[in-house]
Amino acid sequence: MNAEKSPVNHNVDHKEIAKFEAVASRWWDLEGEFKPLHRINPLRLGYIAERAGGLFGKKVLDVGCGGGILAESMAREGATVTGLDMGFEPLQVAKLHALESGIQVDYVQETVEEHAAKHAGQYDVVTCMEMLEHVPDPQSVVRACAQLVKPGGDVFFSTLNRNGKSWLMAVVGAEYILRMVPKGTHDVKKFIKPAELLGWVDQTSLKERHMTGLHYNPITNTFKLGPGVDVNYMLHTQNK
């Protein structure tokens, strides 16, 4: 290992990576553990494309891309997409699925901090979906995302609020009652309050543009975007 890479490699939780490695082969199973990600992906994609003024012809980085659900969908919109993840197995699944689908995505196994050291200011759009709550130092990820985007470019984050309601819905409800995601997927202590995320953003060149909640209705079994950021939320920022 190159010695200069060791500090940024510290921002990796190997237990978190192992959780996703164990189920990577089922990433594209529409009825499997990642069914919620497939269900919400059209909402995510629509929000990102609308707020960024379209994706066609743009250079996009998906941080924490996993098996490539969002990365592939952005490539289908005409973007040149790079997917970044530290999980070997999810990336192998992503590469194979892209090959089978005839979609061009460049998948890279390295931390966002490592990538920022080599590719600062090279992306029109950077997305970081449900990744911040899975690393030891989420603020470092925010800083790296700010470094990677071009002036005037867009950076999108999504994560989970930290409060009793989010614990009840995202952990108790989603993992143990509805079994929408595997048990142990989330650790409420790692959830991030919007004020915390905005504080980290304010310490970079990024500026907040819009925030929205992602809501699940268990009665209708549907998802929607709208006001209220008590549980899942998305943040659109722009490089000054």
Curated annotation (Swiss-Prot):
One of its GO terms (biological process) is methylation. It catalyses: a 3-demethylubiquinol + S-adenosyl-L-methionine = a ubiquinol + S-adenosyl-L-homocysteine + H(+); a 3-(all-trans-polyprenyl)benzene-1,2-diol + S-adenosyl-L-methionine = a 2-methoxy-6-(all-trans-polyprenyl)phenol + S-adenosyl-L-homocysteine + H(+). S-adenosyl-L-methionine binds at R44, G64, D85, M129. It is an enzyme of class 2 (transferase). O-methyltransferase that catalyzes the 2 O-methylation steps in the ubiquinone biosynthetic pathway. PANTHER family: METHYLTRANSFERASE, UBIQUINONE BIOSYNTHESIS O-METHYLTRANSFERASE, MITOCHONDRIAL. This is Ubiquinone biosynthesis O-methyltransferase. It comes from Escherichia coli O6:K15:H31 (strain 536 / UPEC). The lineage of its organism: Bacteria, Pseudomonadati, Pseudomonadota, Gammaproteobacteria, Enterobacterales.
